[in-house]
Amino acid sequence: MVKAISSNLGYPRLGEKREWKRALEKFWNGAISEEELLAETKALRLHALKKQQEKGIDLIPVGDFSFYDQVLDTSVTFGIIPKRFQHDGGKVSLNTYFDIARGKSDAVASEMTKWFNTNYHYIVPELADADPKVLDNRALYYYEEAKKELGIEGKPVLVGPVTYLKLGKGNDAENFEALLDKFIPAYVEILKELERAGAKWVQIDEPYLATSFDKSEIKLFEKVYQAFQTAVPNLKIELQTYFESLDYYEEVVNLPVAAIGIDFVHDHGDSLEALKAHGFPEDKYLAAGVIDGRNVWRSDLDAKLSLLTEIADYVTDGKLIVQPSNSLLHVPVTKLSEPDLDEVILGGLSFADQKLDEIAILTKALTDGAESVTAELEDARAAVTALNESSHRNNLEVQEAIANLGNVRVDRELPFAERIKLQHAWLNLPLFPTTTIGSFPQSPEVRKTRADWLKGNITDAEYNAFIEKETARWIKIQEELDIDVLVHGEFERTDMVEYFGQKLAGFQATKFGWVQSYGSRAVRPPLIYGDVAFTEEITVKESVYAQSLTKRPVKGMLTAPVTIINWSFVRDDVPESVVANQVGLALRKEVEALERNGIKVIQVDEPALREGLPLKQARWEKYLNDAVYSFKLTTASVQNDTQIHTHMCYSDFDDIIDTISALDADVISIETSRSHGEIISTFEEVTYDKEIGLGVYDIHSPRVPTVTEIQDNIRRALRAIDAKQFWINPDCGLKTRKEPETIAALQDMIKATKEVRAEYQVLEK
C-alpha cells in the first residue's frame, strides 16, 4: 500500500444551474447591485468548496474562482490595465474589470483568445510598458475566506509568471527576460502574504511547460522558481503542468519546488515513459493527473489504479498526489442533474463532482488497499463495460462505411479558378459582397418560446410558426440593410454544435451539462457516445423557407466535423479521426440535401480548427491532414456552381495558412477585429488564391463600431487582399448581441462598405 494525497486543480464556476452566469448578467443589466453580485457569487464559491471538503479532497483549490477569467484576474492583481481604460492606479473596480473584458463606448475590449487547445477563452494581457504592482491579492482573500467560513486549509491557485507573460501581447522575445524580472518581485509579494497568512501549499499553473519551446527557455523557470524558493522556503509550491507531456522532463522535475504536477491523460503515454527512464526526485511530491479533466467519460478505475501503482514505484512514500489532469473548469458540475438520460449512457458519465469521487476512490485504494473500495471499483467496471459493449456504441452500417472510405470522392470536380467563374455568373454580386456569419440575436422572446416548446407548453405547430415569423422578420431586416448574401438567423438553434447533436445518431444532449466558454457565455457540449449517422434532414426546412422569402441568395449553415468534435465531449474508445469521418459522412448527406432543395451557397463552419491543434508541433501534421480530409468529405460532392463558405474565429493563422487553402472552400471568413487586425499581416506575407472575408468589427462587445473604424479595417485588409477576392462581414455570429446594437452595427458596416466600394469603382474607371 502507498500513502497518497487527494487533490483538485480547479472547480467549475458556473454553478449547477448556471447561477454564476445569471448573477453576472443581472449585474451587467443593472438588475442587481455590486453588493448583491458579491453575495450571490460568494454563496456559489462556498458551496463548491464545501462539496470538495465533503468528498474528502485533501488539497482543495482556492482562488480558482473568477468573475470572468483567471488570466484577467492576474492582470488586475498586478495593475496591468490598458491605458484606454483610464485606471487611476488603485485597486481595480469591478466595473473597470468588466470593461476590459467587454469594452465600453470609448474603449475597445482587450483581445480574447483560446486557452491553449481548449474551448475556454482568456483575456489577453497587454504588456507594453507593464509596471507590475500588487493592487489586489485575490489569492489571499479567497484563502482567508475559505479558512474563516469553512475551516478549509485551501491551496491558492495562481497563473504562473512565465505562462502569463507568454500569453500576453507586447512580450517580444528580446526583452522577455527583462519583463519577467519586473514580475518576479510582485509574485514574491503575493507569496509572502500567503505564507504570513498561514498557507501551506500554493498551486502555480505553468501549462506553457507542456508546449513546444526552445530548451534555452528552461532558464526562465529556473530563475523564477529559485527566486520563489529563496523568498518563501516554507511554502510548498506545486508547479502544475497540463494538457500534454513535458519535452524537458528532467529539467522540469528538478526545478526548486515542492511538487510537480504532470498530466498522465493527454500525454500520449510520454509521461510514464519519462518517469521510467529518468526517475523522480526523492524530496518532491509528484501530483499525478490521472483523471481526465477535459472529458466526461467515467474512468476505468482498474486501469487508473494500475497506472498509479506503477507511478508510485518511482515516488517517495507519502509524496504521491492523486488529481485530475487539469482544472475541472472544462467539464459540467454534476451528472446528478441528468436523471432523464439513458441509464447506460448516464452510468458511463463522470462530471466534475463524480471526478472528485473517482479521485477519492483511487486515493483510498492506494492508501488502504483496493479491497477497501471493492464495491466502488466493481461499479465503475460494470458501467464502463456496459457502455462499450452496448448497441449505443456500435452501428455496423457506419463502421462498414468508414472501412470503405477509399471509394468516396473527397475533391471538388473542378479546381477553384474554374468553378468560381460559374459561381460568379449566377450570383452576380457587387464588389465587396456583404454577408453575416450566421446567427442573429436570440431575444428573450426567442428563448422563452423555445423553453415553452421544450416544456410542452406550446405545440410543434405554434413553435414552428414562431420560428418562421422570426426568420421572415430578419430576412426583411437584411434586405432593408441591403446585405448581399443572407442567412436565416438560426433561431431554431441553441448552439451551433448542440443543434446538430440533437439530429444525428450517436449524439446525446444534456439538460445541465454547461461549461464556460468566455465570460458569462456557457455552452452545452453534446455527448458523442457512439457511432455517428445521418438520420433526418437537419437544416433544410429552415433554409428553404428563408430562401422562399427573398431573391437574394440565402446561405445554408452547417458546423464542420472538427468543430463538432472539439466542441463536444467525444467518446474515448476510438480515435477522434474516426469520429470526425463519421460526422463528415453524415454531414455530406445534409449538404447534398440542401443543394437538392435549391440552396446553392452553403457555409460549413470550422471555427475550432486552430484551437484543436496539438500543443506539440510534432503532432500537427496528422491533426491537420485529418481535419482537411473530414472537411472535404463533407463538402466535395456538390456541383461546381455551388459555393462553399467556411468560417473560423479567435485564431492565429500564419502557421496553418496552407491547411486553410487545402480545405478548398470557395470563401472563408475569419475573425479579425478582436485580434486588432493582426491576422491581416498573414495575408500580407502570403498569396491566398480563394475569396476571403476578414471580420470588420468585433461582435463580442456590445459596443457599436463607427463607420470610420470599419472603413479603416476594410482599407487595411485591402492592402493585403485583392479587392475582387474580398468579402465584408462581422467577426462572428450575432446570437449573443441585442437587436438594436446589431442593426446599428450592420448599418455602419453597410454604409462603410458602400463608401469604400464607390471609391474603388471610381479608381477602376
Swiss-Prot record:
GO molecular function, one term: zinc ion binding
Required cofactor(s): Zn(2+)
E.C. no: 2.1.1.14
Amino-acid positions noted as binding L-homocysteine in the UniProt annotation, renumbered to this chain: I437, G438, S439, E490, D605
Pathway(s) per entry: Amino-acid biosynthesis; L-methionine biosynthesis via de novo pathway; L-methionine from L-homocysteine (MetE route): step 1/1
Binding residue positions for Zn(2+): H647, C649, E671, C732
Keywords in alphabetical order: Amino-acid biosynthesis, Metal-binding, Methionine biosynthesis, Methyltransferase, Repeat, Transferase, Zinc
Reactions it catalyzes: 5-methyltetrahydropteroyltri-L-glutamate + L-homocysteine = tetrahydropteroyltri-L-glutamate + L-methionine
Gene Ontology biological-process entries: methionine biosynthetic process; methylation
Residues involved in 5-methyltetrahydropteroyltri-L-glutamate binding: R18, E19, W20, K21, K114, W567, E611
Binding site for L-methionine: I437, G438, S439, E490, D605
Purpose of the protein: Catalyzes the transfer of a methyl group from 5-methyltetrahydrofolate to homocysteine resulting in methionine formation.
Record-stated family: Belongs to the vitamin-B12 independent methionine synthase family.
Name of this chain's protein: 5-methyltetrahydropteroyltriglutamate--homocysteine methyltransferase
Species of origin: Listeria monocytogenes serovar 1/2a (strain ATCC BAA-679 / EGD-e)
Source taxonomy: Bacteria, Bacillati, Bacillota, Bacilli, Bacillales
